[in-house]
From Swiss-Prot:
Belongs to the phosphoenolpyruvate carboxykinase (ATP) family. It is found in: Cytoplasm. GO terms for biological process: gluconeogenesis. PANTHER family: PHOSPHOENOLPYRUVATE CARBOXYKINASE (ATP), PHOSPHOENOLPYRUVATE CARBOXYKINASE ATP. NCBIfam families: pckA (TIGR00224), PRK09344.1-2 (NF006820), PRK09344.1-3 (NF006821), PRK09344.1-4 (NF006822). It comes from Bradyrhizobium sp. (strain BTAi1 / ATCC BAA-1182). One of its GO terms (cellular component) is cytosol. It catalyses: oxaloacetate + ATP = phosphoenolpyruvate + ADP + CO2. GO terms for molecular function: ATP binding; metal ion binding; phosphoenolpyruvate carboxykinase (ATP) activity. This is Phosphoenolpyruvate carboxykinase (ATP). Substrate binds at R61, Y194, K200, R322. CDD domains: PEPCK_ATP. Involved in the gluconeogenesis. Catalyzes the conversion of oxaloacetate (OAA) to phosphoenolpyruvate (PEP) through direct phosphoryl transfer between the nucleoside triphosphate and OAA. Mn(2+) binds at K200, H219, D256.
Length: 537
């Protein structure tokens, strides 16, 4: 077996059971990985230097194909939200992965999940594709060269899109599989070329281990102002986490995954993974610039046949086009990935019904209610099985597919942290205004940015608020620079009776969804629910 690159010779591929490999390329950088990827025909070069790859059948995550080993160590798992396989089935899958790898050239990266040295997880990722190796090297945190000589992984991932699972033998649903064994700290990914499965496997692992160490893992972006005022933005894919946290007046901590621990907030990653459908220089200059340079990886972005210039408006392959780039491609990104305890928590919802206000102030009890509810609209393309229209979705903790533990674990941690650090909480609608999806229009990003700026700099505390009669939270009535009519969504609808009917229906959906949490929360949180009587009228 031929090996190249810097590595720990005493802890190589054989320690994972990989044998009879053709080659292993260790910890290669972008230039070498570009070379291997282009030579193998895995990807093409865009006009501006980004590497552009097509993921084929799978253009998003496939949560129905994700499985966790059920054994004595995982009885604390939230099995209502996770699928299980036996240790024996996983072992058969593992052995078949090892057999499939024989004779292949693999790329290995030694990386960290987590910017806080106390809580990070040492992660080794084996991939059969060079561009997947570049992707995960970009998304996680790279050790210093000197650390690679003695690197011993805690978590190992093997990612082979050419592998096909056997549902009968392996206890899975299809030929596509993501399988996690928390006891052995092994993740197996097969059948899918969608690179996002790798990063979310690391996130799921951190979601499992960190709470017992006093760290709340969060599906959120984060930034910090010049006065050290950290803000975190919860939200599902497509709700604006990446876009809204990339603010030229604030330092970006990260765009997707963070921990909130004893010393503040820290990024789990060293890169960004931005949705780039309809990406433009005018609306998102930082992300546009980062996506159009050497070292960026574009997924399913259509290139002009002659010029090779990316056409970010073209969603013919998928609406879930993506750009992965190093965090330091954003000019004002943090170099440490760490920040003080938050002053503001923002929950982003892409409301497909168009009845939530553009911003609302939440009490601590309302914050826990909306965190456990995790309301948004699933946006087309981020998962398999969705159509072209957004669907209303309650994804608890704004990240249900990535939660190995009961949602109440994360909800209680958030409530304690909000109380301990006197945090202001906000609900922001980045979805529709002036009607439902199909009738109304998307909330103008300039309005959202203006409202967020006012919330984060403290000026929103000084305006007049009204109590929303449907949801009970506080909504500003006026703010300089923002049209007053947009602050009260009913004013943006031509048909007021239809608005009332739609708002009542959404209240009912919240109530129905939250029923499963009522026994786990106290009276304050139950009282923070939208008005039950109103929904039943």
């Amino acid at each position: 077996m031929q090996e190249t690159g810097i590595r720990n010779g005493a802890f190589g591929a054989d320690k994972f059971g990989l044998k009879n490999l053709k080659q292993v390329h260790w910890n290669l950088g972008a230039p070498q990985l570009y070379q291997y990827s282009l030579a193998a025909g895995e990807a093409v070069l865009s006009a501006n230097g980004a590497l552009c790859a097509d993921t084929g059948e799978f253009t998003g995550r496939s949560p129905k194909d994700k499985f966790t080993v059920r054994d004595a160590s995982t009885e604390k798992m939230w099995w209502a939200g996770n699928q299980s396989i036996t240790a024996e089935q996983f072992e058969a899958l593992y052995q078949d992965f090892l057999k499939h790898a024989e004779g292949k050239t693999l790329f290995a990266q030694d990386l960290y999940g987590g910017a806080d040295p106390t809580f990070r997880i040492k992660t080794r990722v084996f991939t059969e594709l060079a561009w997947h190796s570049l992707f995960i090297r970009t998304l996680l945190i790279r050790p210093e060269k000197i650390e690679l000589d003695t690197f011993v992984p805690e978590l190992t991932i093997i990612d082979m899109p050419s592998f096909r699972a056997d549902p009968k033998r392996h206890g899975v649903r299809s030929q596509n599989v993501v399988a996690i064994d928390f006891a052995r700290k092994i993740v197996l990914i097969g059948g899918s070329y969608y690179a996002g499965e790798m990063k979310k496997s690391v996130f799921t692992t951190l979601n499992y281990y960190l709470p017992e160490r006093g760290v709340m893992p969060m599906h959120c972006s984060a930034n910090v102002g010049p006065k050290g005022d950290t803000a975190i933005f919860f939200g599902l894919s497509g709700t604006g986490k990446t876009t809204l946290s990339a603010d030229p007046n604030r330092t970006l901590i990260g765009d997707d995954e963070h921990g909130w621990g004893p010393s503040g907030v820290f990024n789990f990653e060293g890169g960004c993974y931005a949705k780039c459908i309809k990406l433009s220089q005018e609306a998102e200059p930082q992300i546009f610039a980062a996506s159009n340079r050497f070292g960026a990886v574009l997924e399913n972005v259509v290139l002009d046949e002659d010029s090779r210039v990316p056409d970010f408006d073209d969603g013919s392959k998928t609406e879930n086009t993506r750009s992965a780039y190093p965090l330091d491609y954003i000019p004002n990104a943090s170099r440490t990935g760490r920040a003080p305890h938050p002053k503001n928590v923002v929950m982003l919802a892409a409301d497909a019904f168009g009845v939530l206000p553009p911003i609302a102030k939440l009490s601590p009890a309302q914050a826990m209610y909306h965190f456990l509810s995790g309301y948004t609209a699933k946006v087309a393309g981020t998962e398999r099985g969705l159509g072209n229209e957004p669907q209303p979705e309650f994804s608890t903790c704004f990240g249900s597919p990535f939660l190995p533990l009961d949602p109440s674990v994360y909800g209680n941690m958030l409530r304690q942290l909000i109380a301990e650090h006197n945090v202001d909480c906000w609900l922001v609608n980045t979805g529709w205004t002036g009607g439902k999806y199909g009738t109304g229009s998307r909330m103008p990003i300039k309005v959202t940015r203006a409202l967020l700026t006012a919330a984060l700099d403290g000026s929103l505390r000084n305006v007049e608020f009204r109590t929303d009669k449907y949801f009970g939270f506080a909504v500003p009535t006026a703010l300089p620079g923002v049209p007053s009519e947009i602050l009260d969504p009913v004013n943006t609808w031509a048909d007021k009776a239809e608005f009332d009917k739609t708002a009542r229906a959404l209240v009912g959906m919240f109530q129905k969804n939250f029923a499963k949490f009522e026994a786990q929360v106290d009276a304050d949180v139950r009282a923070a629910a939208p008005d039950v009587k109103l929904a039943a009228e």
